[in-house]
UniProtKB/Swiss-Prot annotation:
It catalyses: (2S)-2-hydroxy-3-oxobutyl phosphate + 5-amino-6-(D-ribitylamino)uracil = 6,7-dimethyl-8-(1-D-ribityl)lumazine + phosphate + 2 H2O + H(+). (2S)-2-hydroxy-3-oxobutyl phosphate binds at residues 85-86, 127. GO terms for molecular function: 6,7-dimethyl-8-ribityllumazine synthase activity. This is 6,7-dimethyl-8-ribityllumazine synthase. Pathway: Cofactor biosynthesis; riboflavin biosynthesis; riboflavin from 2-hydroxy-3-oxobutyl phosphate and 5-amino-6-(D-ribitylamino)uracil: step 1/2. It comes from Herpetosiphon aurantiacus (strain ATCC 23779 / DSM 785 / 114-95).
Length: 153
């Protein structure tokens, strides 16, 4: 049996992070978790690029532009979309998830979805480094593993 899997060694990998400025009090914690995890796994600080955009809705376009340049092994998306009283939540969540998935499939570059989609601010805070771990850190680990896996295929 031939088993192909990625490892968690980040040395030599180039990773882009696209983060929404909206709800940045949550996004900042996600970013800190992602960057710290990338560095702990050997990604050089100079090989981490961070692009800020106004909100989560704009993330797919920024991801597309970064992916088209072909300079990164993986892209991490970070942000927080919190449900409100209107249907805006569904519009943004669907646009982000389908947009980044399309870029990933079209380019072959792994795009990790670290945009929190929660019903409350409390849930978002929990997933940004308190009770429920840090989704930014989790995405960083997955980005390293996917980049290394794809290098073997």
């Amino acid at each position: 049996m031939n088993v192909i899997e990625g490892n968690l060694i980040g040395t030599g990998l180039r990773v882009a992070i696209v983060i929404a400025r909206w709800n940045d009090f949550i996004g900042g914690n996600l970013l800190e978790g992602a960057v710290n995890t990338l560095k702990r796994h050997g990604v050089n600080d100079d090989d981490i690029s961070v692009a800020w955009c106004p909100g989560s809705y704009e993330i797919p376009l920024v991801v597309k532009k970064i992916a088209e340049r072909g300079q990164h092994d993986a892209i991490i998306t970070l942000g927080a979309v919190i449900r409100g009283a209107t249907s805006h939540y569904e519009v943004v969540v669907n646009a982000v998830s389908s947009g980044v998935t399309k870029v990933m499939h079209d380019t072959g570059i792994p795009v990790l979805l670290g945009v929190l989609t929660t019903d409350t601010i409390e849930q978002a805070i929990e997933r940004a480094g308190t009770k429920a771990g840090n989704k930014g850190s989790e995405c960083a680990v997955a980005a390293i593993e996917m980049a290394n896996l794809l290098k073997q295929l």
